[in-house]
Amino acid sequence: NAVYWNRRYDPDSIIKDKHIKRQLESININVRTFNASLLNEPWQIATKSGTPFRVFTPFWKAARAQPLTTPLPSIMPSSIFKTDASETLKDWNLTPSNPNWAADWSNYWKPGEVGAQAQLHDFLKFQLDGYGKQRDRPSLQATSRLSAHLRFGEISPLQILTDVTDYVRKKPHLSDAKSKFLSQIGWREFSYHLLYHFP
């Protein structure tokens, strides 16, 4: 028997996860945790003296110098532990109605991995070229709109980095836009680095 989960990096979650791990191991259940939300673990990027970074630019330079793992293909498990029947989300009456204040959300965000993939594809095809000049203009829809997908684990920063790099390899005139966009992924990494080391 084993339980697997993706690591979290804020202090309260680390404490909770360690407690859960101890409880499971006390009843002989193996626990394996993984990094699914960052390019590098917060403890993997350090200054030459071995201390955590406090400034973005040297942090991102050091992070980019790290070797990256190749994203693995999605593999469906051969079997999944069966659970007892439970209520559906529809049973909980969470879908808004009268008024349906969420009616337009589907125009802006398609939840799930498929929606994340489509959003990344559309961003690369239609918006990456102007990203450097347009990203700071709130009146334009010039950002990647991947934040929610990243937050909920529907796409990984490694997949974004890999897909953007592969796309720009075929369109080298976009290399400056690529650097500007990937630096935003870097800022996300840096925020986790700071959260972990300096909560």
Question: What kind of feature is each model-predicted range?
Answer:
Residues 51-198:
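Glycine/tryptophan-enriched, flexible segments
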